[in-house]
């Protein structure tokens, strides 16, 4: 579910079409600011919303202020690149504690934690898997199932995968952030959507 940006050696989520083009344009700038792109979606038709989910390069959660910085940087690039005709919205959020696993490095970084995954293409007759993250190798995510067996999931076939919120995950996230985990709820920092109005001459 991840792809390598050859020009900048940045691992991106597996995306296609417009979403891939936008991700490839903004990812290097986000990396320069110390952030990584976790997920990108373009939703809606009349006024599409570009949803950016990001975190820090060390995997720690970002704040509302970080979201604003990312929004400003990405918005400036998209204003020039103009990938979407007409008006569009830009929304930025953190990955959250129970974050999506969209790249090989996510499966490696969160080895030992619980996760759930769903495939586009069935593997041995099943699409849904849950268990302990064991890492990634050769373009596959490895997850140890409840019966002790390991499932090898092709990253490109993963429709969605996410960490399961547990006490251990909360403690690990708090330690990474250098704060107490007391009262942590796994919520995401989110910046209010910004509207990019139609430019003169746009229809």
Curated annotation (Swiss-Prot):
Alphabetical UniProt keywords: Cytoplasm, Ribosome biogenesis
InterPro entries found in the cross-reference section: Ribosome_maturation_RimP, RimP_C, RimP_C_sf, RimP_N, RimP_N_sf
Primary location: cytoplasm
Pfam families, sorted: DUF150_C, RimP_N
Region called Disordered, residue ranges: 179-203
Annotated SUPFAM superfamilies: YhbC-like, C-terminal domain (SSF74942), YhbC-like, N-terminal domain (SSF75420)
Locations listed in the record: Cytoplasm
Signal peptide, first to last residue: none
HAMAP family tied to this protein: RimP
Homology family: Belongs to the RimP family.
Function: Required for maturation of 30S ribosomal subunits.
Name this polypeptide is given: Ribosome maturation factor RimP
Annotated source species: Gluconobacter oxydans (strain 621H) (Gluconobacter suboxydans)
